[in-house]
Amino acid sequence: MLRLVENHSLAHSAAHSMPRTAAFFDLDKTVIAKSSTLTFSKSFYQGGLINRRAVLRTAYAQFVFLAGGADHDQMERMREYLSALCRGWNVQLVKELVAETLHDLIDPIIYDEAASLIEEHHTAGRDVVIVSTSGAEVVEPIGELLGADRVVATRMIVGDDGCFTGEVEYYAYGPTKAEAIRELAASEGYDLSRCYAYSDSATDLPMLEAVGHPHAVNPDRSLRREALSREWPILDFHRPVRLKQRLGGLSVPPRPALVAAAAIGAAAATAGLVWYASRRRSTAA
């Protein structure tokens, strides 16, 4: 059973009359212009979580990521490095550092084109789901900033002392992203043949293949080749813009509410995969 949130019953009844739909967005280099995790390295340094050497190493990783994307082996090395790096970090301190610097670091690097797409999908009655390999402590507040209805993100094991152990509970990457959206579709009544997905990386091919309307955004060479051969739309996002400038006087969306997942598969359930459902979610697709 899913723990209900406000007006969820209305959405549930509507789902019986019409299949619901969603738009699934990768985060890094799809919605924002950089790696969400690596962007906070300076904040983590100032907060005493990492040293200067780690700052330089993450800066180099950011450069490699931006220059050519990351293939499977690079993503695995990055996962191992970041897992070891965050061992012993106090989770509450991480959340506080992210909250304090979120608008300064992330707001300016959100693609205007992505923000427009998110608005268009919401206007069309679709849920918006951020599906990211980055850690939940970083992705969840970014999802809130963007007005996303749900978030799927990597989760680290937290010890009894409130610190990361350095072990990964759930890794939102490649096939596991596709598995997550299929399970979410089953629980929420999404018709995946009518859903949309957006990513920049060939590592997200399973997620793109899972929906009826896949889109390549700023694709790496491998994904561009696949998109061309399959005649998928290829989008070019290149205009980062501050949401405050873009949205003007609009109010910030209400904070998403946690949805407890029960039917997401044994591996994902054990891992503590989190989804967020906005209280302002649409009731039809």
Feature names for model-found ranges:
Residues 2-71:
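Active-site neighborhood of HAD-like aspartate-dependent phosphohydrolases
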Residues 36-37, 49-120:
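A metal-dependent, Asp-based hydrolase signature
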